[in-house]
């Protein structure tokens, strides 16, 4: 909590003491209260609609049987537009569609904002889940993951002094187990 002025002061005072501030970012999903998602669910024609993962369907039949990490379906129906959106976590945390280059650019811009403010880097939560393919039941370490990470590196992490930490809390349970989508 606090203001942007408070954050500016925290960054400046921390630097004076040789301490770097890392911003904790979740680039996989956002809040269902975020302006992008509110706009996205207002109309299939809204420019933000493709910032999220949507599938057609009827109210009583989700697009697949995928389960949320927290239990229940990984799909939530929006009757106003007759579509389901995908969420690996809570329904209040819709997953973003990293296949959309406009979304990626907006997320790069968010990160650049913080770099310009003077942060030392980022902790990227569940970063291994941005390249999902829900139609193939792939929600972690998807085929485009390295491409997306390279995009972050090339567009944002160009300052050699920046620190990045990626968190993968599902990987620890699957590291030495065969993946269902791999032979």
Task: Report each predicted region and the residues it spans.
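Hydrophobic residues within beta-strands of alpha/beta enzymes
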Residues: 122-124
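Acidic/aromatic-lined carbohydrate-recognition and catalytic surfaces
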Residues: 1-108, 112, 116, 127-182
């Amino acid at each position: 909590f606090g203001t942007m002025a408070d954050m500016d002061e925290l960054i400046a005072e921390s630097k004076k003491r040789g301490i770097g501030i890392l911003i904790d970012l979740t680039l996989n999903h956002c809040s269902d209260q975020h302006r992008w998602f509110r706009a996205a669910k207002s109309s299939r024609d809204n420019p933000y609609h493709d910032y999220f993962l949507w599938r057609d369907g009827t109210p009583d039949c989700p697009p697949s049987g995928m389960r949320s990490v927290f239990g229940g379906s990984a799909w939530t129906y929006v009757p106003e537009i007759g579509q389901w959106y995908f969420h690996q976590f809570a329904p209040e945390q819709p997953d973003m569609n990293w296949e959309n280059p406009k979304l990626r650019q907006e997320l790069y811009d968010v990160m650049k904002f913080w770099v310009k403010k003077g942060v030392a880097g980022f902790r990227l939560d569940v970063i291994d889940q941005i390249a999902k393919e829900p139609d193939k039941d792939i929600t972690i370490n998807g085929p485009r993951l390295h491409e997306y990470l390279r995009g972050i590196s090339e567009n944002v992490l160009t300052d050699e002094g920046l620190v990045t930490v990626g968190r993968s809390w599902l990987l620890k349970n699957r590291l030495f187990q065969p993946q269902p989508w791999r032979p």
